[in-house]
């Protein structure tokens, strides 16, 4: 059995830039008729969540927190 291998999270900036670009281009549907959350997620909430990920989420900060813990990969 192979030993666990130390691992650090390091998402390339190009990937994060691509994600922000795709979030900027998101096309939202109309809100489904009926009560919000009755037939899926509330449109306003999803739009707010998208804006947060696009404009405010600090991936590097959270990446550093996660890398503060010992991370490993292991074959299963």
Where are these regions (language model features)?
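Non-catalytic accessory segments flanking enzyme active sites
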Residues: 15-76
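Basic/polar N-terminal segments that are highly enriched at the extreme N-terminus
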Residues: 1-6, 10
